[in-house]
């Protein structure tokens, strides 16, 4: 096990890695560009690269940059900011309606649902209601089981950023603070955990295992081990940051085994910020000196033998097909991916035969999506799958029927619409999603009937809400549209997509920006906070769990800050006029001498002075 090969060297912090046949796709820090590294001479070391998508720069806080890059069952590549359709080596990006899907890490299940997490917002499982590719509804308030948000840490070390501690229990973490590196367990070695989501929490020194249950018309998430955790340690240097369901069916996780894992922006070492005390504590404890001790663990179930790992690259396209039934999701995914990216249509007859003969629902779905990726999925195959005994296959077939539904196939439309009467909530919801996937005039009557017939479904109600939000966004002026993109990427994880703040226990992670007096009456001060940041999790005497607002003066220019302020002002606070880049430049000049983040006391003083200038009320 203790072997490694250096394939790519002399690069700075590669963040995303995805094997793609004989190439490896990589995204590096401070960039969104995707590079394909290759090894043309076959010596096991990359000898060149080519750009497959020019994403430009993405500088600033490394916590906010890209992660993920996974191949999904729908032949789409996902990361936390974009999903990329793949066709003959070309990538075409499309963003999410929520901006950023996840903070650090991305996972998928056998059905193609994508799972996100947020660190500062204390969320260890997000956005898992629908298969990837659809609008993402707001369901966090109704999808979590009792005590799901409570970590059961046994490490008594106070070194967190914003998680909060129970001091009656000797500084045991009481709120999730650093969720990351999630993966869905998809292995025949661990059938009891199949479909469960493992999420790393390096501040709590634990790995949470989440299980999902269909209840009351929604998929709810619960801690698999109530009152405890899947893996946890009292060792203060145990820092699990990444997990994978491996090709051999075993569970792997990466432990940085490090004293400090926080990047510098949220780890001040001098000044008046209350977090400087944390730096002083951990320095005194010697934690700054513990690094370069990382390790990878493999968890093998008792009395089980790891699965044999096939060398898929050496297999012919026809030889790949049986591996769609392999016991490891990792192997299944790569077999399907290779079938698609090779583009070898000679295997289409074999795939069609496999779809008819296999009794494995997951393998059947993978084969059908491989046929779609080869532009060879027949109508007859979809029709037959719509009548499959497995609801799981039916959902995939409805999803795959969209090409025919929106292409005018009335007979198939009638067959799919009839499935709205299914006893399975996933089937009913997929009927709704597939008919509403595009604004097709010929389907308007069916869409209207579904709006009425499925109106009581909880997820339909939430989906219609986000549809209305997208219609409203379409009417935004160009400045607000640009600001909405920045807001969703940067601000929503703490302040909420609706601007009303993200819940954390009985309070919020950060202040609500909706009908916010600072935005409405002192927009210059609010702009100054964006530029310089705020130390201390308090505003107007009210505490928040987020810790602090980082400075953005070196991340965004005046035009970008004007755009995000305009979006916040017009969307949440009834501004009548946009903020201009000239106004931001004036504020930037006014606070240039401010060398540290604003404290709550300094902000209150500015408010008493009626702002930085004599502000014009923007209401």
Model-derived segments and spans:
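Beta-propeller domains with acidic blade repeats across secreted/periplasmic ectodomains
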Residues: 1-319, 330, 338-340, 396
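The canonical Cys-X-X-Cys-His
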Residues: 243, 251-254, 296, 483-498, ...
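Post-cleavage N-terminal segment of exported redox proteins
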Residues: 301-311, 373, 403, 436-481, ...
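Structural detector for internal amphipathic alpha-helices that build alpha-solenoid repeat scaffolds
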Residues: 307-310, 332-343, 362-376, 381-387, ...
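Short inter-helical turns and helix N-cap capping residues of alpha-solenoid HEAT/ARM repeat scaffolds
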Residues: 327-328, 359-360, 389-390, 423-424, ...
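Gly/Gly-Pro-rich "capping" loops immediately C-terminal to redox-active cysteine motifs
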Residues: 499-558
């Amino acid at each position: 096990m203790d072997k490694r090969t250096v394939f790519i060297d002399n690069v700075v912090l590669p963040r995303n890695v995805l094997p793609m046949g004989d190439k490896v796709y990589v995204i590096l820090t401070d960039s969104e560009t995707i590079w394909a590294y290759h090894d043309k001479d076959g010596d096991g070391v990359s000898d060149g690269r080519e750009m497959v998508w020019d994403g430009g720069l993405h500088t600033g806080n490394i916590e906010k940059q890209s992660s993920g890059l996974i191949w999904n069952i729908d032949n789409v590549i996902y990361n936390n900011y974009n999903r990329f359709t793949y066709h003959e080596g070309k990538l075409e990006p499309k963003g999410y309606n929520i901006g950023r899907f996840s903070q650090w890490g991305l996972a998928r299940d056998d059905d193609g649902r994508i799972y996100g997490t947020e660190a500062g917002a204390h969320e260890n499982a997000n956005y898992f209601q629908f298969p990837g590719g659809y609008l993402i509804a707001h369901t966090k308030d109704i999808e979590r089981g009792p005590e799901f948000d409570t970590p059961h840490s046994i490490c008594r070390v106070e070194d967190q950023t914003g998680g909060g501690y129970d001091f009656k229990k000797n500084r045991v973490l009481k709120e999730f603070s650093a969720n990351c590196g999630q993966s869905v367990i998809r292995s025949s070695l661990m059938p009891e955990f199949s479909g469960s989501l493992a999420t790393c929490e390096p501040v709590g020194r634990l790995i949470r295992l989440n299980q999902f249950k269909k209840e009351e018309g929604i998929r709810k998430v619960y801690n698999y081990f109530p009152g405890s955790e899947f893996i946890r340690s009292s060792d203060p240097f145990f820092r699990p940051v990444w997990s994978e369901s491996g090709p051999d069916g075993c569970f792997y996780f990466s432990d940085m085994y490090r004293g400090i894992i926080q990047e510098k922006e949220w780890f001040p070492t001098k000044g008046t910020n209350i977090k400087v005390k944390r730096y002083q504590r951990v320095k005194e404890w010697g934690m700054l000196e513990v690094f370069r001790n990382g390790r990878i663990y493999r968890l093998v179930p008792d009395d089980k033998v790891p699965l044999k790992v096939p060398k898929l690259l050496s297999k012919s396209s026809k030889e790949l097909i049986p591996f769609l039934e392999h016991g490891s999701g990792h192997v299944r995914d790569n077999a399907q991916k290779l079938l698609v990216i090779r583009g070898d249509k000679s295997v289409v007859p074999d795939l069609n035969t496999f779809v008819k003969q296999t009794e494995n629902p997951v393998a059947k779905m993978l084969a059908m999506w491989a046929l779609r990726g080869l532009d060879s999925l027949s109508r007859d195959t979809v029709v037959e799958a719509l009548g499959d005994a497995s609801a799981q296959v039916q959902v995939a077939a409805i999803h795959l029927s969209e090409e025919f539904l929106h292409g005018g196939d009335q007979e198939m439309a009638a067959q799919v619409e009839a499935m709205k009467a299914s006893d399975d909530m996933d089937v009913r919801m997929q009927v709704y999603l597939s008919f509403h996937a595009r604004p097709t005039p010929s389907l308007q009557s069916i869409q209207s009937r579904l709006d009425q017939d499925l109106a009581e479904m909880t997820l339909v109600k939430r989906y219609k809400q986000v549809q209305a939000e997208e219609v409203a966004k379409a009417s935004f002026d160009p400045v607000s549209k640009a600001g909405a993109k920045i807001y969703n990427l940067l601000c929503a994880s703490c302040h909420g997509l609706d601007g009303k703040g993200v819940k954390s226990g009985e309070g919020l992670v950060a202040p609500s920006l909706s009908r916010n007096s600072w935005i409405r009456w002192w927009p210059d001060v609010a702009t100054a906070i964006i530029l310089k940041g705020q130390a201390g999790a308090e505003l107007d005497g009210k505490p928040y769990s987020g810790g602090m607002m980082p400075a953005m003066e070196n991340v965004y220019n005046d035009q970008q800050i004007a755009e995000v302020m305009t979006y916040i002002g017009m969307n949440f606070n009834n501004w009548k006029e946009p903020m201009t880049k000239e106004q931001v430049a004036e504020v930037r000049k006014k606070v240039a001498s401010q060398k540290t983040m604003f404290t709550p006391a300094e902000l209150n003083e500015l408010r008493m002075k009626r702002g930085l200038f004599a502000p014009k009320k923007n209401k």
